[in-house]
Amino acid sequence: MKVEMTGEEKQSLLLDLLRQHILGEISQGELLQYLRKNILGMSQTHYAELVGISRRTLTDIEQNKGSQAQGIIDKVFKPFGVKSSLAPIQPHMACYLLVGKRE
């Protein structure tokens, strides 16, 4: 279900979700599914058509299955102004990256 938000609210939500993802609190698939459903209010079929991939590939990404190429991941996140990149595996390093101080 699409939630009506201002541009500022959407940006704030996106930043919070990205922080959760970097800290390992939500998966890449969970992030994408939340954005697709709650920000855009789109079905998998319509979103897959929008970004130019198959619905099956989108399902696999949202369920954290398979091993998609970086280009595919970049395609599915592009409508949100996000691309894939390297991120620390260890939570304390991710926290340092986000906050700028060691814990």
Give the positions of each predicted feature.
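Short alpha-helical DNA-recognition segment
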Residues: 41-59
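DNA major-groove recognition helix of helix-turn-helix/homeodomain DNA-binding modules
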Residues: 69-89
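N-terminal flexible/basic segments that precede or flank functional cores
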Residues: 1-27, 90-103
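The alpha-helix within a helix-turn-helix
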Residues: 36-37, 48, 77
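Residues within the helices of the helix-turn-helix
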Residues: 33-34, 45
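Flexible coil/turn residues that form the inter-helical turn or adjacent wing/linker of helix-turn-helix
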Residues: 28-29, 39-40
